[in-house]
């Protein structure tokens, strides 16, 4: 199987998001990379499902709460920017202050 660098990045994010979901299920608080991966995966999959940029920008802030991440992580993540593929092309989605 031959994957482009972009496809490899998407696969890595999806796998990291899956690990993050399993940790949340066990009650383990997420670290910075896990939180970023989970929010990024939410945006990528939402775009694939046909949701709008505005919806994803809004709802990306509901993926995680402060209680689900390690201390200091919310303060480290001011914005998450994701290039996602929508039915009408690739767009940049920015989720501001994603962990509330």
From Swiss-Prot:
It catalyses: urea + 2 H2O + H(+) = hydrogencarbonate + 2 NH4(+). One of its GO terms (molecular function) is nickel cation binding. Its EC number is 3.5.1.5. Keywords: Cytoplasm, Hydrolase. Its main location: cytoplasm. Pathway: Nitrogen metabolism; urea degradation; CO(2) and NH(3) from urea (urease route): step 1/1. It comes from the Bacteria. Heterotrimer of UreA (gamma), UreB (beta) and UreC (alpha) subunits. Three heterotrimers associate to form the active enzyme. This is Urease subunit gamma.
